[in-house]
Each structure stands twice: as C-alpha cells, then as structure tokens.
Amino acid sequence: MDEIVLAIPSAGTKVTRDILRICNQTECKLKVLPGMYQFITEEVSVSKLREVSIEDLLGRDAIDIDLDSVLGYVKGKTVLVTGGGGSIGSELCRQVAKYNPKCLIIFDIYENNAYDIQQELKKKYPMLHLETLIGSVRNTKRIESVMELYRPDIVYHAAAHKHVPLMEDSPNEAIKNNVFGTYKTARAADKYGVKKFVLISTDKAVNPTNIMGASKRMCEMIIQTFSRYSNTEFVAVRFGNVHGSNGSVIPLFKKQMAAGGPVTVTHPDIIRYFMTIPEAVSLVLQAGAYAKGGEIFVLDMGEPVKIADLAKNLIRLSGYTLGVDMEIKYTGLRPGEKLYEELLTKEEGLQKTENELIYIGKPLEFDEVHFLSELRKLEQAAIDERFDVKEIDSGIVPTYHIREEDKERDSAIYQEFCKLGRASHEGPVMEE
C-alpha cells in the first residue's frame, strides 16, 4: 500500500484528525477530499484531492458564532483597530468589515502592513468607509487626536510587542509599548466616550515568566481599573498561540526545512495551545458582544500540542524522513520561556457564557492605589532605560516569577554594559 485517501467528507474535524494521526504513522502518502461544505457549495471531483496539511492535524470543528449578536453591536458603528496591520489586527479588520460598520479605522505604526490590509479591504468592500492612519499608541497626542476626530464606538486594541525572547532583551520597549500604549489608548477611549474597549491579551499573562507576559498582565489590570470608574465597557480577551501569525512556529519550521534543516525545537516536552487566526478573531468578536465591563474572557484553545510532535508531523507531511534527510535539533528553553502555558490562574476560576468556547475568568482583586503608584515608578524606569524594570514589574504583578537563569543572564549583561559606560538619555516622556 503506497497511498491512503481519506474520503469521508461528512466526518467532523476531530474524527478526521484522529484518523489522520493513525495514518500518519505509516509510510504511505496521505490525501484528503474536501469537507462536506465544499461538496455542497462547489463541484468536487478526484482532482480536488489534496495533500494533508499540518492544519488538518491541528484543526477543530467549525466554531459556532451568534452572528446576530455580533452584527448587533458592530453594524453601523465606528470601529478602531490598533495594530490593525498585524496578524490579529488585520483579521479583526477583515471580519469587522463583513458586518457593515459605519467606519473602520486601521491604526498602525507600520505603514506597509497597514497598506496591505487597506488594499485588500478596498478591493473586497468598495463601499466600506475605510480610514488608514499611521501612528503609535505610545504617542498620547496622536491617539487622542484620532479618538477626538473619529469618535469610535468600539476599540479593538491589538497593538503590542509579542515576541517573548526579543522582549527579554528589550524589556523597556515592552513596557513602553504594551503597558503604557494600552494605558494611553484606554485613557483616550474613556475621555472621548468609546462605548466598548476590547484588549487582545494572551495566555502568557498567566503566572508569567517573561516580561512580555508580565506586561500583558499589567494591561489587563489597567483595563480592569478603568472599567470600575468609566462608562466605557473595558474587557480583555485572553488566548494562546495562533498558527499562521507572524513569528509562529509553523512558518519557521517550513523555512528551516526549505533551507535543508535542521528543524529547531527548544525542548522535547514543550507544549502549546493552538488556534487559527480566524477562529480566535471570531471568538474575540463574540466575546465583545457579551461584554459588560471588567471581564477577562478566556477562549477554549482545545487540546495542547507537543511542539516536538508538531515538528515531526510537519517533517513527515513535507515528504522528509526524520533522521534520514531531516533532523530535529533541541536548542534549550529561551529566556523567559515556559514548558507550558496556562489560560487562567487557579484563583480566577471559570464562568460559562452562551458560547461553549468562551469563558469568563473571575477578576483578581488588587490595590488600585498601589498599582497606579507603581506604574508611575515603572514609567520613569522605562524612560530612563533602567535595567531593573523586571524587578519593578514583579512588584506589580505578584505572579510574575523571573527564572534564576534569566536573572543571572540579565546580571551578566548589566555588568558588561557598565564596563562600557552608560550614555545619558533625555527626552520627552514616552512621546515617540
């Protein structure tokens, strides 16, 4: 037997995935027929047979969304998406555009990303009132001028630095962009009467071991603080890895294989949750419909995936033989990296919503006066490019634990830096 064809279009994603995992253990080539939806909507023939993709092994059944509830709060509204050119932000723009907003505003610091999604939406939705603006959420005057001019009803705040190892080496940038970019955008939303503010958060905010996760936890704390005193409904949506996003492992593995390998995995036991970008964004929109203010919505990410198994499957599906013409190299955990991620703390618990894939985590109590006081110290430390911002962060986020090896690494970098001498830095308060 040389080839296996899975020709059960009526099978759900889980059944298909389980069958493919068994078949993948053989040496046979694997092909699948399109699903039932394609049979109904398209002419399907043997020519439609395709190779099995890694997405077939990661996928889940179609996510059920209450379209009426999403339509009810997006249609006819002015919607601002910060970071609108990024992986999550651009998909937010795509899906919001389908619901006939009064005006959609793409706001991003990277002009090429913003231009790409602008051109895509102009072609697909020629009647859409679309504004594409370049600017930084770190710039108070810029973000406030946008809010004042366009008076958005809804803000999806997706602008953030998300790369864990890079932020470990540039912690002050994570603080400036993530923490105070969120603070300034949220403050502007409150000032100019935004009705709904949805923060895109991450599972790395739970018991963080890296500055990126700690910064996103502070973002959650910021919007929870605003929600207590503002007429704006401030909420956060927390989810794990999305495959296909900038910097995700699947594109990296494919590039490594195209270059002849090896495929690099940090640890044989590291696991992650995965969801497609469209799945995550559709649930973000649904969570926004449920929002009353102050909630942290947690998305059901499905079953965790061992990254080593993901690499092995991708090697197999790409036509290589592990150990013969493609190798896996284990490189060790990177600074700030965890073996596994958590979607919520034990204290947060879970409350169900109408959608079985969306839960609400119980907000953790914290001293808001102390929090705001520490934020001021953190702001000044980031402006001064100090090396102790991680320690200041750990005083603000009690669940943030810096790994000992990372402390030693940071200390060594600091000692070397001091030998070179430190140039003074003066500039406006985070108005870049």
Specify the residue positions occupied by each region the protein language model found:
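Strand-loop microenvironment adjacent to phosphate/nucleotide-handling motifs in alpha/beta enzyme folds
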Residues: 64, 69-73, 191, 221, ...
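SDR active-site strand-loop-helix element
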Residues: 82, 107, 155-159, 197-202, ...
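Conserved mid-core alpha-helix of short-chain dehydrogenase/reductase
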Residues: 142, 184-188, 274
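Conserved Rossmann-fold NAD(P)-dependent oxidoreductase catalytic core, especially the SDR/UDP-sugar
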Residues: 26, 41-42, 157, 161-220, ...
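N-terminal Rossmann/SDR dinucleotide-binding element
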Residues: 47-51, 55, 59-151, 349
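Proline-aspartate-enriched helix->loop->beta-strand connector
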Residues: 1-3, 101-102, 147-156, 164, ...
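Conserved residues in the N-terminal Rossmann fold of short-chain dehydrogenase/reductase
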Residues: 133-134, 176, 330
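Phosphate-bearing ligand-interacting subdomains
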Residues: 1-51, 135
